[in-house]
Amino acid sequence: MKIENIEINIGIFGNVSVGKSSLVNCILGKKLSEIGYSKTTFVPQAYTNFGNREYHLESIRHLNEMANDQAKTINSTDKIKHVMHYIDKFSLLEDSRNGINDKIDSMFKIIIWDMPGFDTTHHGNMYLDWLSTNIKIFDIIVYVTEIMDDNLTMFDMLVSYVRKYDIKMICVVNKCDNMKLDKDSSVISLGTIDHDNRYIKINNTMANYATQYSIGNNNYITPFLPISVQNYEYFGNNLLLKNCDNDFGFEIFIASIINAINNHKLYFAVKHINRHIKVSKSKSMIDIIEYSRIVRKCNAQSRFIDISSGYNLSKYNLSENFWNLIRDTITSHASKIVQKCVKVVNDGKNIGFRSFDDVNIDIQVFLSFVNSVEIFKDFDDYPNDLVEYYRIKVISNLLNIYDVIADFEYTNQHYLDISNIFLYLELIKEHMRTEFDNYALKFIYTHRNIKTFESHYQESLINILKFIADNLSCCLSRNKFTSIVCMILINKQLYMKNKNNYLQYIISVKKLIKSVIKPTITINYIGPLDILIETTKKNVSIAISDNRLSSFYKQDINMFTVNNQLNNFYLGDTFDISVDFEKKLLELVKFE
């Protein structure tokens, strides 16, 4: 059983010769199951369209005949084996000719079972034993009776199973061959008074069961739907009579199946997961992530489907095996990660690139796993305390590693690259939001004294600083952030000092500061921006000063430098100075 395919087993049940196999053939859109009184089904025959496989009609019929013949000699329950057939499609569930607009989600693997009539077969008791053992296979039961059949013993038995195992049940009355619908009054007539009375009697019996078992308000069992397989086979496939309404009962019946599936996706997903846990040999983190994907896809915003019914919803819960798998997986992975974290921290300044990368990847995988598991938090028995304990424990150990590497100064270490810092801060923001300011400032502080300003580095630095500025939460952190930005800008001035166009650059920066920042400076406050302004002004002054030893005590303007720059302007021999980097950084600290 594959995780991603939610298996839904629909069993067609009823007494002998009520038209079960004929009904199956109508759903399949092809006569695969033998019909007629002499063609009674003796062994469960299952059909699935999953994979849209090619099939051979005669081969399927032959296999069914062989299985039925062999079943006649069965003398013990354990020898009853079902026959599985793969076909291309279920016509009635997939075609739109009946005006049914809703479609069954492709993630569902539908299996339709043509079941033996357990009431009068010579192996009746064995089949009843088989059913009591295998009833949990079924997700939806279609109970078929006929308009002249008063024997509801099997119905009574199936109702008890429906309640015990939370199975959906759709009830139909077949052989309503003279049924008519008055479209003006929406009143159904079954053709004769006797048939009308029997139909009322059957549904009254259904109402009594609903009252007796308190199942009236939760849609586990439908009222009996009148259908005529005979009419559908004739009218439904006869293009000359396509406007006739004799097959309208089938439209209601098929809509009931489709709605039972589409309206209870989470219910079927939970049953599927419980089955998979029970039979799967491989149980891993990947399996759990797949389970969470299934639940998320099945519209798990509400706790359970049927949440307004007032029924005991705990029956829909995931199995104890599932919760044990969750607990064991989280505990095991978290413990291994903590051990790795301790080793990395103990390495201190000798932290290894591979060991750090290894543990960092493990932690990201673990936290992604925890996020996926949270889709189950509204289910009973979700181990919230355990999940939170190990999530915080892993994050705390990760922060211990970050403390170590944040003490370094950036000198092209891989783990202090801007791209990696982005990942660290995103992770902290998501899982430990209160620590974001602290570690954002720590990490960017490591880049305050960089030795080079290539364009790609400047672009990355702007992006990370903007990300930090957008997410800082308090004024104190913003002031510290401004200090770091000012350090970077002053360091850039130092980097440019020996460049040919330094004087032009530093004057451009001074003018930029004056236009962008100075209007926002308050008189009664001295902060990092004041230091930046005064340092820039001083650097302009130094750039045009005479630095010879004779001018040590009294700095004069270096006329050579000034005239040289003016001469360049005169000759047009100047450089285009870009201060976009500086402008973008200054825009980030205007909030001061």
From Swiss-Prot:
InterPro entries attached to this UniProt entry: Dynamin_N (IPR045063), P-loop_NTPase (IPR027417), Small_GTP-bd (IPR005225)
NCBIfam families: small_GTP (TIGR00231)
Molecular function as annotated in GO: GTP binding
This protein's name: Uncharacterized protein R618
Cited Gene3D superfamilies: P-loop containing nucleotide triphosphate hydrolases (3.40.50.300)
Domain of life: Viruses
Pfam family, one: Dynamin_N
Lineage of source species: Viruses, Varidnaviria, Bamfordvirae, Nucleocytoviricota, Megaviricetes
Cross-referenced CDD domains: Ras_like_GTPase
Organism: Acanthamoeba polyphaga mimivirus (APMV)
